Swiss-Prot record:
Entry EC no(s): 1.2.1.59
Lineage, highest ranks first: Archaea, Thermoproteota, Thermoprotei, Sulfolobales, Sulfolobaceae
Positions with a binding annotation for NAD(+): 13-14, 111, 169, 303
UniProt catalytic activity: D-glyceraldehyde 3-phosphate + phosphate + NADP(+) = (2R)-3-phospho-glyceroyl phosphate + NADPH + H(+); D-glyceraldehyde 3-phosphate + phosphate + NAD(+) = (2R)-3-phospho-glyceroyl phosphate + NADH + H(+)
Compartment annotation: Cytoplasm
A single BP term in Gene Ontology: lysine biosynthetic process via diaminopimelate
Top-level taxon: Archaea
Pathway: Carbohydrate degradation; glycolysis; pyruvate from D-glyceraldehyde 3-phosphate: step 1/5
Descriptive protein name: Glyceraldehyde-3-phosphate dehydrogenase
Annotated organism of origin: Sulfolobus acidocaldarius (strain ATCC 33909 / DSM 639 / JCM 8929 / NBRC 15157 / NCIMB 11770)
GO terms of molecular function: 4-hydroxy-tetrahydrodipicolinate reductase; glyceraldehyde-3-phosphate dehydrogenase (NAD+) (phosphorylating) activity; glyceraldehyde-3-phosphate dehydrogenase (NADP+) (phosphorylating) activity; NAD binding; NADP binding
Binding site for D-glyceraldehyde 3-phosphate: 140-142, 195-196
Keyword NADP appears in the UniProt entry: yes
One Gene Ontology CC term in the entry: cytoplasm
Length: 343
């Protein structure tokens, strides 16, 4: 099998996780990762045996820090078939010009504007729309969580309306300079939040309005959705379709005696998950409520890992390597992503 040569531009929260995921794919080869600062993440990448690349002007800086550099970012791009751009939001648009110059395909993250790519992507929703596309944007962690739930329900019964509230984590665990630490912030106070617009880049034409808050936590986001479907949907119907959908897990809070994002993460630790990651959308089963054609539910989104499998599937879609179902199945198997119940 000829393996796809994948480069990672940006080795932070998302980039390092995607790098590890690529190493587990039988049809992919990680040729290197790029960093612009010689910090602890660069040292850990070197310890893992990843080839490190940086900007031409920073090569000496890395070497002076004791970090071996394989070459410039341009060298890495030239040697790749496709690039995962996991640079900070807005930076990817600048790198796109370089990718185009070398005739390389690229996968961008949700921090970029949607017009950076040919298509915004969520594997369960619109994999086929991304086949053979040169530039794909994996939507943000929050939008990925929303879309997994909405597309699953929409495939069962057409959704007429969605209203939702996103309680965002204030920072990732490693981000010591972000907050708030003693406030809940309207983010933004105006309605709708950008999440509704982002959903519409994938699930087009749906009536959706969202609001968003930032809470002083680092663990996960928490969403509440109120959904109106065309026809009556029972709780039993929802439990059946959600429990049989990959990348969605249910948590029975009464049975597990767990009803918080902290306990979800603790379960991940106790199960020995790598980095304690939870790339699945975790729905509180007890929160699922139906009344005729109305649905209410709550779920947690692990912002550090939920988009990782989406990036892997986006690579296969862009290069037309596998069908939707084949790619999702292989990604889930290699990354040990489940369906059914968290515990």
């Amino acid at each position: 099998m000829v393996k796809v040569k994948v480069a990672i531009n940006g080795y932070g929260t998302i980039g390092k996780r995607v790098a590890d995921a690529i190493r587990l794919q039988p049809d992919m080869e990680l040729i290197g990762v790029a960093k612009t600062s010689p910090n602890y993440e660069a040292f850990t990448a070197m310890r893992k045996g990843y080839k490190l690349y940086t900007t031409k002007e920073n090569i000496q800086k890395f070497q002076n820090s004791g970090i071996n550099v394989a070459g410039s970012i341009e060298d890495m791009i030239k040697d790749s078939d496709i690039i995962i751009d996991a640079t900070p939001g807005g930076v990817g648009a600048n790198y796109k010009k370089i990718y185009q110059e070398y005739g390389k395909k690229a996968i961008f993250q949700g921090g970029e504007k949607s017009d950076v790519a040919d298509v915004s992507f969520s594997a369960l929703c619109n994999y086929n729309d991304a086949i053979n596309k040169n530039y794909i944007r994996v939507v943000s962690c929050n939008t990925t969580g929303i879309l997994r739930v909405l597309c699953t329900i929409n495939n069962f019964d057409k959704i007429e309306k969605v209203r939702g509230t996103i309680v965002r984590r204030a920072a990732d665990p490693k981000e010591v300079k972000k907050g708030p630490i003693n406030s809940i912030v309207a983010d933004p106070a105006r309605i709708p939040s950008h999440h509704a617009k982002d959903v519409l880049t994938v699930l087009k034409g749906i009536d959706i309005i969202t609001s968003a808050l930032v809470a002083p936590t680092t663990l996960m986001h928490l969403h509440t959705l109120f959904i109106t479907t065309r026809n009556k949907v029972s709780k039993e119907d929802l439990l059946n379709i959600l429990s049989n959908t990959p990348r969605i897990l249910l948590l029975n809070t009464e049975k597990a005696d767990a009803e918080s994002t902290a306990e979800i993460m603790e379960i991940a630790r106790d199960l020995g998950r790598y980095r304690n990651d939870v790339p699945e959308t975790v729905i509180f089963e007890d929160s699922i409520y139906t009344n005729g054609n109305e649905i209410f539910l709550m779920y947690g989104v692990h912002q550090e890992s939920i988009v990782v499998p989406e990036n892997i599937d986006a690579i296969r879609a862009s290069l037309n390597i596998m069908s939707r179902d084949e790619s999702i199945r292989l990604t889930n198997e290699t990354l040990k992503i489940g369906k059914g119940y968290l515990i």
